[in-house]
């Protein structure tokens, strides 16, 4: 029985899943929009939104928590110097998921996940697979 088990397995073991979402969260923070499958985008939302909430209060302890979750000082710096102040007045819902059709090879549903207050001039999209 799978009572009270939240989250998707995505055909990966736990360490692979953790590493994948750590990498995807870093890519999303760095580029502010990535293209991935719809289930991965929905799960990534559960990883990124608490990181941005953490970044709204700048402290050494919060920076260490963010580093423990991302393992990248560049990502931590962007979270606390840019994204935290940008979303200071927003109480949640920092990401948006836009469906974008199906992948050619296996017909998997694809989606863009982006930060909501992203500058419109950034037209490039990074594929995260």
From Swiss-Prot:
NCBIfam families cross-referenced by the UniProt entry: L17
A single cellular component GO annotation: cytosolic large ribosomal subunit
Keyword Nucleus: no
GO biological process terms on file: translation
Pfam families xrefs: Ribosomal_L17
Protein family per UniProt: Belongs to the bacterial ribosomal protein bL17 family.
Identification of the protein by name: Large ribosomal subunit protein bL17
Keywords: Ribonucleoprotein, Ribosomal protein
Record flagged with keyword RNA-binding: no
Single GO MF annotation: structural constituent of ribosome
InterPro entries: Ribosomal_bL17, Ribosomal_bL17_CS, Ribosomal_bL17_sf
Subunit structure: Part of the 50S ribosomal subunit. Contacts protein L32.
